[in-house]
From Swiss-Prot:
Name of the protein described by the UniProt record: GMP synthase [glutamine-hydrolyzing]
InterPro entries assigned to the protein according to its UniProt record, in alphabetical order: Class_I_gatase-like, GATASE, GMP_synth_C, GMP_synth_GATase, GMP_synthase, GMPS_ATP_PPase_dom, NAD/GMP_synthase, Rossmann-like_a/b/a_fold
NCBIfam families per the UniProt record, alphabetical: guaA_Cterm (TIGR00884), guaA_Nterm (TIGR00888), PRK00074.1 (NF000848)
Pfam families xref list: GATase, GMP_synt_C, NAD_synthase
Organism the protein comes from: Neisseria meningitidis serogroup C (strain 053442)
Function: Catalyzes the synthesis of GMP from XMP.
Keyword Ligase: yes
Keyword set includes Nucleotide-binding: yes
Top-rank EC class of the record's enzyme: ligase
Location of the GMPS ATP-PPase domain: 198-390
Phylogenetic placement of the source organism: Bacteria, Pseudomonadati, Pseudomonadota, Betaproteobacteria, Neisseriales
Any one cellular-component term (Gene Ontology): cytosol
Underlying gene: guaA
Domain Glutamine amidotransferase type-1, first and last residues per copy: 5-197
Subunit-level organization: Homodimer.
Length: 521
């Protein structure tokens, strides 16, 4: 299918993937490539426009230089943060270290231009933005004009209207920049003239064709967790190759309450997919005994999954592929997407936890999609709402929600506490009648392997602590902690302490992402 495309060159920002998400929200196809993508490949890609991402480095570092031939292609270019500095530096301007690092909220005063026209909210010629930079442009290249400034950054926005080159010293892709989406839409749709053709039905058509081409007549095994990602991956792959797909549902003893039965019933009823149920609790618990480091736990769980899949593969004559529900945020948190340029935060079970000697080839049909796109895809594939809009659940399961060593005792306590929390979220609504489960993007309980003193009845208790975590996010790259009603939190706490023997204290996590990640490990 021929469609207009935007190219994003990644200089290493942790939020570069959000640029791609915002472009796709405008229904325009885009791809993210490393900053050092060869010019001939850029020409072959034939983009309608180019976006240069932010990054943690200086324009004077020779290792982070794109081919400046991009400025001779006759297409619009938007430089974001480092991308703006790169543009200014290579087109004859000057970039110098700032007197002070600018990080966080700022207001940019603007003048009307092609980039800023009709994007304001309440205050004309004012943008509410998120800054994150040290260096700044101190002298404009020839042909450029200042179109925005802040008190500490006199050149916060610049443009060359004739060549359609634009630079902005803030991040329009993050939700903290209120008019960011409108600004990116202005660039992509109006300045670049890209026609919106990126939709989930189109994606299904292309993905199905790609899966069939990759797999051929081979059989595929998919690790089914019951979460959104693996469920949608199963539906998409099943749409492409039917009974060549066998889902392996591994009960590693780290699932949510009654999840095994629910997942088996759901897939038999809704998808008609072949599912093998493997009870491997003893195998996983034995390997995890005494292990406290979260990275080691992830890698052990990943390795044990592969052992299980290898055992099942021997029963399937043509099995050559291991399918996973890996999505964009998984990849960027492990190493910075396809470009491998962003600073690693932690390994993801679907990405960094697999052994090098894995016998099966990987099939990851969702790895270029964000979570909300995955949900859209699930609906387009005809999956039921309760499956598609279920909160995410990590591949390692409760193994990364039990801090430190994993024990069956801890998992049993956590399962009960988590189920109570989710029940109350589903049963409590806001003033508009929407459940707090639907209002939050992800919610769960975390087991803390420490004991605290309590009093129940006339006696002293010395039992474990659980933390409740609930966040609101549109993309899982950044997140706000959910401001749940005190009455709801109190009810959850009372039920857990009274109904789960072994827990006597409940706390609520009020950390955002960043600085914290959504999961505790």
């Amino acid at each position: 299918m021929t469609q207009d495309k935007i190219l994003i060159l990644d200089f290493g920002s942790q939020v570069t993937q959000l640029i791609a998400r915002r472009v796709r929200e405008a229904h325009v196809y885009c791809e993210l490539h490393s900053f050092d993508m060869p010019l001939d490949e850029i020409k072959a890609f034939n983009p309608k426009g180019i976006i240069l991402s932010g990054g943690p480095n200086s324009v004077y570092e020779s290792d982070y230089q794109a081919d400046i031939g991009i400025f001779d292609l006759g297409i619009p270019v938007l430089g974001i943060c480092y991308g703006m500095q790169f543009m200014a530096h290579h087109l004859g301007g000057e970039v110098t270290p700032g007197n002070q690092r600018e990080f966080g909220y700022a207001q940019v005063k603007t003048i009307d231009s092609g980039l800023t026209r009709d994007i304001y909210d309440d205050a004309p010629n004012t943008l509410d933005v998120w800054m994150s930079h040290g260096d700044k442009v101190s002298k404009l290249p020839d042909g450029f004009a200042v179109i925005g400034d802040t008190p500490s950054c006199p050149i916060a926005m610049m443009e060359n209207a004739e060549k359609q080159f634009y630079g902005i010293q803030f991040h329009p892709e993050v939700t903290h920049t209120k008019q960011g989406r409108a600004l990116l839409n202005r660039f992509v749709l109006d300045i670049c003239g890209a026609q919106p053709g990126w939709t989930m039905p189109n994606y299904i058509e292309e993905a199905v064709a790609k899966i069939r081409e990759q797999v051929g007549s081979d059989e595929v095994i998919l690790g089914l967790s019951g979460g959104v990602d693996s469920s949608v991956a199963a539906a998409l792959i099943h749409r492409a190759i039917g009974d060549q797909l066998t889902c392996v549902f591994v009960d590693h003893g780290l699932l949510r309450l009654n999840e095994g039965k629910m997942v088996m019933d759901m897939f038999a009823r809704n998808l008609g997919v072949k599912v093998i149920h493997v009870d491997a609790e003893g195998q996983f618990m034995a390997k995890l005994a005494g292990v406290t480091d979260p990275e080691k736990k992830r890698k052990i769980i990943g390795a044990e999954f592969i052992e299980v899949f290898d055992a099942e593969e021997k029963k399937l004559t043509n099995a050559k592929w291991l399918a996973q529900g890996t999505i964009y945020p998984d990849v960027i948190e492990s190493a910075g997407a396809k470009t491998q340029k962003a600073h690693a935060i932690k390994s993801h079970h679907n990405v960094g936890g697999l052994p090098e000697n894995m016998k099966l080839k990987l099939l990851e049909p969702l790895r270029d999609l964000f979570k909300d796109e995955v949900r859209e895809l699930g609906v387009a594939l005809g999956l039921p709402r309760e499956m598609v809009y279920r909160h995410p659940f990590p591949g390692p399961g409760l193994g990364v929600r039990i801090l430190g060593e994993v024990k069956k005792e801890y998992a049993d306590l956590l399962r009960q506490a988590d189920d109570i929390f989710i029940q109350e979220l589903r049963n409590t609504t806001d003033e508009n009648g929407t459940s707090w489960y639907d209002l939050t993007s992800q919610a769960f309980a975390v087991f803390l392997p420490v004991k605290s003193v309590g009093v129940m009845g006339d006696g002293r208790t010395y039992d474990y602590v659980v933390a409740l975590r609930a966040v609101i996010t549109s993309d899982f790259m950044t997140a706000h902690w959910a401001e749940l009603p005190y009455s709801l939190l109190g009810r959850v706490s009372n039920r857990i302490i009274n109904e789960v023997k072994g827990i006597n204290r409940v706390v609520y996590d009020v950390s955002g992402k960043p600085p914290a990640t959504i999961e505790w490990e």
